[in-house]
Regions:
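Short, non-transmembrane alpha-helical segments in secretory-pathway proteins
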Residues: 25-59
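Low-complexity, Gly/Ser/Thr/Pro-rich intrinsically disordered linker/tail segments
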Residues: 334-343
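Boundary at the C-terminal end of the N-terminal hydrophobic targeting segment
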Residues: 18, 22-26
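Exposed beta-strand-loop-beta-strand "reactive/processing" segments of non-cytosolic proteins
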Residues: 46-89, 94-95
């Protein structure tokens, strides 16, 4: 029996679709707060520092903000609003956590940069952004991935230590993202032949899915629970020939796809957005999410997951940073590109 998994293996940033400019333009803080209140009760502007992300239009003469970002003063949650309604209204939101410009997943930082470029484009070139309209198969899909995993302990329980410093190495964002997809499917049941055996959970010939937790943040987990997720991470890294490091772990996506096909009984095909007409790429994402298949994304040095969408078509993103800044985002304004499907 083969398992359905949906994977995206590359990202191309920012695809804009010019349209006739209507009666639209800048969105001030007051109007942005009004939009934000639909998602959080008491929006307060996210503090920006010289060391953090400055969502400013570098080419706009009055240096007005490209984005308005708000946290919920009375609880958890955040909202990101475009400062020009020719780009769109709410670009991202979450009912959990809060945005910290100095502690943000790198792929989210890249997405905010793409949003900023979109606003720059409409301001400088006086165009409006009209993303392709795609109707999802279902009204919405709740997040399919319950895991909020990361790259450090206990996920790196069995990763090799540095040969020079003896320090533990990271699992790598690619391995963590794919491990979360496999966890969502609880697939495979048995560990592949040929992986290194050892003591404890490493001696098992199966994956101990029942002992893996949605989150290990804050501690409170048992040794067996830590080992269970560590085995999955180590097997994926080993089979994909990951290059481990104390500052970061690299993984060739092609080798990971080969490992998934050969060891995990999956088949892989690739779709490139630039070669697809209209909104076919976005439709493919909606379709797979509607079938219960998380979408794996990677581009540059980052990997993360699409695992749901809301009534407005914003896609839920799991950044792979232990749940940090997970939320719903507009992936149509800052368009993305290459997709791979694993069966």
């Amino acid at each position: 029996m083969k398992k359905n998994i949906f994977i995206n293996i590359f990202i191309i940033v920012l695809s804009l679709f010019p349209a006739v400019v209507g009666l639209a333009g800048p969105v001030d803080v007051a109007k942005a707060k009004e939009l934000a209140r639909k998602y959080i009760s008491s929006p307060v502007s996210v503090a920006e520092t010289s060391d953090g992300f400055m969502a400013k239009s570098r080419r706009y003469s009055d240096d007005s903000p490209a984005l308005h970002m708000f946290n919920n003063q009375n609880g958890e949650g955040f909202v990101i609003v475009a400062a020009d309604d020719r780009v769109g209204g709410v670009l991202g939101y979450s009912d959990k956590g809060s945005l910290d410009t100095q502690n943000m997943p790198a792929p989210l930082m890249a997405l905010l940069t793409d949003y900023t470029r979109a606003v720059e484009a409409v301001r400088v070139d006086s165009i409006s952004v009209t993303p392709y309209y795609v109707k999802p198969p279902k009204a919405f899909v709740k997040p399919l991935v319950s895991a909020e995993w990361s790259q450090d302990y206990p996920y790196n329980y069995y990763t090799p230590r540095s040969s020079t410093s003896g320090k533990p190495t990271y699992t790598g964002c690619t391995i963590t993202a794919m491990a979360q997809v496999l966890f969502a499917h609880r697939w495979p049941k048995m560990r592949p032949e040929g992986v290194i055996r050892g003591e404890g959970a490493m001696a098992y010939d199966y994956y101990d899915w029942d002992n893996m937790l949605d989150s290990y943040s804050g501690g409170g987990y048992s040794e067996a629970q830590g080992q269970a997720v560590g085995v999955l991470m180590r097997d994926l890294g080993k089979l994909a020939q990951a290059t481990y490091g104390v500052n970061g772990t690299l993984c060739d996506e092609g080798k990971l796809w080969n490992a998934l096909q050969y060891y995990y009984n999956c088949s892989v095909r690739q779709l490139e957005k630039d070669r697809l007409p209209g909104g076919e790429f976005l439709q493919a994402i909606y379709q797979e999410l509607s079938l219960g298949c998380p979408v794996f994304m990677t581009g540059g040095d980052h990997a993360f997951l699409y695992d749901g969408y809301d009534e407005n078509g914003l896609v839920h993103v799991n950044w792979g940073w232990a749940g940090l800044d997970n939320g719903y985002f507009d992936i149509n304004t800052a368009a993305t590109a290459v997709t791979t499907k694993i069966r």
